[in-house]
Amino acid sequence: MKMFHKIYFGDSVVKLTEEMVKSLENEIVFIATASKDGVPNVAAMRAIKVLDAEKGIVLIADNFMNKTLKNILENPKVALTTANCKDMPYQYKGTAEYYKEGEYLKIAEEVDKALKPDLKPKGAVVIKITEIYNLKSGPDAGKLIAKDE
């Protein structure tokens, strides 16, 4: 797997558990972005693959992104959470890069083919997760679970 062009994939404190991987790959995932001016956007995503759980690397196929893509290109900071917050109550924060060709686009094509064979991605968003937060209600709500230095 090639390295990000701008983001370092080196040693990572943020590791995704098997349960987190299953949740991200099988649930609807919401991605939050913001424009360079701070205007927020949230969009539901389904075509997702965890590329490396040990390094917190996640790929999302770009099938219908408009505001989300514009925001990522202006401001690569993103946050993710799954629709199933009851069982997998986590928020993932990280940095995204966009690819319109190459290895990541090929992976996005495979992800789409498994979901819906007639989908053809425009590109791939690859996210390096740098922080994970607990979203479970109670005294630990909002608590930082893991963070890369």
Swiss-Prot record:
Organism: Methanocaldococcus jannaschii (strain ATCC 43067 / DSM 2661 / JAL-1 / JCM 10045 / NBRC 100440) (Methanococcus jannaschii)
Signal peptide annotation: none
Domain of life where this protein originates: Archaea
Gene3D superfamilies in alphabetical order: Electron Transport, Fmn-binding Protein, Chain A
Record-given protein name: Uncharacterized protein MJ0282
